[in-house]
Amino acid sequence: MDDLDALLADLESTTSHISKRPVFLTEETPYSYPTGNHTYQEIAVPPPVPPPPSSEALNGTVIDPLDQWQPSVSRYGHQQPQSQSPIYSSSAKSSSASVPRDGLSSPSPRASEEEHVYSFPNKQKSAEPSPTMTSTSLGSNLSELDRLLLELNAVQHNPPSGFSADEVSRSPSLPNVTGPHYVIPESSSSAGGKAAPPTKEKPKRNGGRGIEDVRPSVESLLDELESSVPSPVPAITVSQGEVSSPQRVNASQQQTRISASSATRELDELMASLSDFKFMAQGKAGGSSSPPSTTPKPGSQLDTMLGSLQSDLNKLGVATVAKGVCGACKKPIAGQVVTAMGKTWHPEHFVCTHCQEEIGSRNFFERDGQPYCEKDYHNLFSPRCYYCNGPILDKVVTALDRTWHPEHFFCAQCGVFFGPEGFHEKDGKAYCRKDYFDMFAPKCGGCARAILENYISALNTLWHPECFVCRECFTPFINGSFFEHDGQPYCEVHYHERRGSLCSGCQKPITGRCITAMGKKFHPEHFVCAFCLKQLNKGTFKEQNDKPYCQNCFLKLFC
């Protein structure tokens, strides 16, 4: 606790360097901050430019109030010792930082609301500070304040050994304070009389109060730092002697305006950094007790985000009614829901089993309890066409123990689609009726065309009935008898003619004995002399002009 007291004292001394310097803003919102033991007078008509404080005011020299101010104006006494700090109280603080003297007229209610005179710890200055040095000192003081706040946070998150965790948790929290409470002693009305300097009350620290008792004091110091840059209130004009150089006043006002705005900006950045640091420290303190988590897989990041979103909504009091349990991740569904196959799904979890693409509002197919997109289902499970080997999506033709697209089932020879008459199969291929019989049906021995209906089997060949006739005279065979010569059917006459067994005299077939002469065949009774018609049976004859003659007729006729 001694280290904490030292930090608070160092913090108070740091803010006293900032608060004792008067800051002047623009003419629209002129402010003055009295330092030292001066009494200021409100002037009804303000001058065009607020005068800078004199060196006596900055150095804390006491000026006789009777010589400086008119007696008809209400006076406010502000006296602060150099070595003492303001008194801090844990109760709610008053928004006014000045207390009117006893015996003087109190300001009107409007003046008490709009005019605030702030008193800050003052130290003697040997000379008027330059604006450059003041701005540099302000930046260094803010940096020092930032460092002290970081150390204070470290002490708050790690309580001293003298405090147990139960004491810290049971320590009562103090009410919020709106600003530091300054107790200002009343000045004596007699010239030269001064009141005794007030004593500073340090924050009480005992065993019954925890680390949270220190925080109001730190917040009071921060409020004191914020009060160095005042909020806009009606102008307060201070008359404090002659202004020797208007150019110097303008330059001083511009420099102090820059310093004031810079201090405000740095203070905002400091407060933002302090909030971020507290948030990070709480996160680290909460995460130190839990074991280190492994890096989540990319596939589970979405599930983690959904789970954290639902928990955050529950913490905020937003009731999320589950619409079901997802069939994939087995987690409740709070947003959009997909109902399919008797289950409910997250839209991003209802995906194709094969390609893992989100199905959404597209058509899908079910197989063994698993959803498939239309493309993958047909590629995996649909029958394939025997002709193109592609999946069959719509109508299917089943033939020859195979499946076909209707547009791919046609005659293998002519490419014509099969009609009502159907098709014929040969060697695993389908043919139309015409091409099948033309290619594979038995051919007629007479016309060489396919035999489609009745036929005659003869001479090891099939014949149309109308085609089985004599190959010479095309006469149908009576009683079914025919003669064959060189694999062709003939009638008896043409058969003997083809073979040469036809009598040359009577032009009838020779069925018995025959005589062969002059390259011809004759019945014995039909081989006679061409002149006398006597039978030439002795075996001797004369031939003249392809005709036979007996010996006597030949001599008579030709000798």
Curated annotation (Swiss-Prot):
A motif (LD motif 2) lies at residues 144-156. It comes from the Eukaryota. Residues 263-282 are annotated as: Required for binding to PARVA and ILK. A motif (LD motif 3) lies at residues 217-229. Phosphorylated on tyrosine residues during integrin-mediated cell adhesion, embryonic development, fibroblast transformation and following stimulation of cells by mitogens. Residues 326-376, 385-435, 444-494, 503-553 form the LIM zinc-binding domain. A motif (LD motif 5) lies at residues 301-313. A motif (LD motif 4) lies at residues 266-277. Its main location: cytoplasm. Residues 79-98 have a biased composition (Low complexity). It is found in: Cytoplasm, Cytoskeleton; Cell junction, Focal adhesion; Cytoplasm, Cell cortex. Pfam families: LIM, Paxillin. Interacts (via LD motif 4) with PARVA/PARVIN and ILK. This is Paxillin. It comes from Gallus gallus. The gene is PXN.
